[in-house]
Swiss-Prot record:
It is found in: Cytoplasm. The lineage of its organism: Bacteria, Bacillati, Bacillota, Clostridia, Eubacteriales. Its EC number is 6.1.1.12. Belongs to the class-II aminoacyl-tRNA synthetase family. Type 1 subfamily. It comes from Clostridium botulinum (strain Hall / ATCC 3502 / NCTC 13319 / Type A). It catalyses: tRNA(Asp) + L-aspartate + ATP = L-aspartyl-tRNA(Asp) + AMP + diphosphate. This is Aspartate--tRNA ligase. Keywords: Aminoacyl-tRNA synthetase, ATP-binding, Cytoplasm, Ligase, Nucleotide-binding, Protein biosynthesis.
Amino acid sequence: MGEALRGLKRTIMCGESRENNIGQKVTVMGWVQRKRNLGGLIFVDLRDRTGIMQIVFGEEINKEAFEKSDNVKSEYCIAVTGEIVKRQSPNNDMETGAVELKGEDIKILSESETPPIYIKEGLDASENIRLKYRYLDLRRPDMQKIFMIRHKTCKVVRDFLDENGFLEMETPILTKSTPEGARDYLVPSRNYKGMFYALPQSPQIFKQLLMVSGYDKYFQITKCFRDEDLRANRQPEFTQIDMELSFVEEDDVIELNERLLAKVFKEVGGIDVKLPIERMPYKIAMEKYGSDKPDLRFGMEINDLTEAVKNSEFKVFKGAIEAGGSVRAIKAENCATMGRKQIDKLQDFVKTYKAKGLAWIAYKEDEIKSPIAKFLTEEEMKAILEKMDAKAGDLILIVADKNNVVFESLGALRLHIAKELDIINKNEFRFVWITEFPLLAYNEEEGRYQAEHHPFTAIMDEDIELLGTEPGKVRAKAYDIVLNGEELGGGSIRIHDSKFQEKMFSVLGFTKEKAWERFGFLLEAFKFGPPPHGGLAYGLDRMIMFLAGTENIKDVITFPKNQNAFCPLTEAPNVVDENQLEELGIKKIEKED
């Protein structure tokens, strides 16, 4: 059993001691990083979340403390009292390396078994072991730095929004299921057997109701839940920085959030954000980068060759154009010497994005090499090279197909090649607003339109009349903030008219009865003078990944789930007692083989 503190107080953190503390008598508490016994002296590196302090025990300093210190092992939790002195041999690799603590008294607060993972920076252990022993993984200095960054980010956000007149308000966690998009996590009700709450995918509807309530500027940093198939860097529960404002238009929300981003990235990460941030309509983003999340840290933009080859007899080009598609290409500079095997791999790569194939032209010093050259006239080849601004050494990669296939395949290929060539500047932070999103996307399987963002998004004023005739052409008052090819956040101006919201539900295939059954409380609220309003939400976890310099979302969440939405630490989800299920009116059905 460990020793009690008995009134002993920590007076300094391990990572805080400097030369100006020399001569002070202090008490430090933390975990033993390592111990070195040099015979007459014992050195202990003591660690807490601020850093490491070297402690020296010796018979001449204090015999009892010296003998007791010989019993400590790695990860023992101890308290040491003594005097800070100048080190005879400073360690310039440590922030506290100019000083050390002469250990005059030691308390062993608790012992530790040999840890299953080595607690150090740059740990090389399996993800499952790290998550199973997460409380040990979180002791590592690089993990503790991440969560100090997370804390500071939340503080800067709160301070900024408070200074700009926002109120931090909470919205319900147990709410109504309104299935549209990702699956809800459902919570059975004991009082209303056979009925369920849902955990919120976002506070969307409630924050709009707060605007109807007159709170004007709302924010919260809140948990959200989505029961979806997990992809890389997705978690079933995640954290949003959520906000909503009344009496605003798009420019107001964007300008405020540019100032917020500049403040957060400067104060937390030391990163300068150039304002104003570039804005790019969705249509341009897709045509130039094949993505609504373009990475602008490198070029290799998509070029439209349709006009250059519109009269071509090459069946692949001709067929795509006649079917209403297009012929587009990217240029990989200095890649004309790429071998056939490498190009074949690129062929296979674009086929995973439903492209039928990949045509290529290698512009070499002494020749133009291409398997499609024989199908093109000299004028067509010249027009392609001019359109691509090609020079000797360049490789042109062409896809001809339906526009959505062309954009998606070339957009993915652009990123793939940039990573392979290592031409992306990892120290650059390129923000861009993507605007004028399509309001709706047609679901061919269900035979109806679906909201591209959510069904509460307002329409561009000039597109309102298209809603009843050509809904696929309607643009939304929506905006996403993208950083280095990743969506950092997104938002929109909202519909604030009950009748127009009903019309939107109708376009989405809802009957009036179904719309009122699911969203009647919102439609009813909109009858009582709702203000124009809009907002935005950031993925806090994604933001911390950028600020902390990690590519793994699990690194920025204290107790994350694994790729199967399972917690190796607590073994959740787990089987519950039959009496709990009976109380909820739930009966398990055994799965048949």
